[in-house]
Amino acid sequence: MILRIGKNISQFYACSTFYLDSLVCSPQGSEILMKQMLAAMKDSKPLPAPKMTKEYHYKNYPTNSITTYIEIKTPRMITEKYEKQQWQLLDSTRNISGYPCKLAVCQFRGRTYKAWYTMEIEIEEGPWKFHGLPGLIVEIADIWDHYHFTLIGMRRENIKPVCFYRTDRDDMENVSRIEYLKGSREQYKLIQKRKKRRGQTMAYDFLERDYH
């Protein structure tokens, strides 16, 4: 995963998602992607596709909002106001990737999280929708460790401006966050039923669990 922090916007996305989107938008991208897919099928290897749902998350500082571009079968856009996490700051300390960190915990949309932040980087930012601590979040995970983000590297020079990518697709659908989660949950239930008939199991729950 990649977190890019700009003056007015931050951007969070998977490396594989960005690679494929960049490839498709390049002049020979579609041809290259097709060759990669044919080679993968020939060698019985996984197809060159994101290992998760295609998502881009943007924190828009001037409008105090978060916009998510997400795609499973069709592209959707979700815009929501910041929901500040209610952090409890604790005394525990730890060193992560060379940075002295302090511990904070919060409950957010159905999960309890432990976050390690460093005051050596005085930016109230973090991965996904996390923010609001007195320093950059360098590691955060829910208490079941279903979702875990850890800083492994940082670049501060030769960075392209952080901005919204163009999403002027005719089939883009605007939906609410809860509407999207409920709809996606119904799709996963159907997939689970099909797998169960084949003797397979599928254990999965969303990062946000407040849609019940």
Can you annotate each of these PLM segments?
Residues 3, 95, 129-132:
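Generic detector of intrinsically disordered, low-complexity, polar/charged segments
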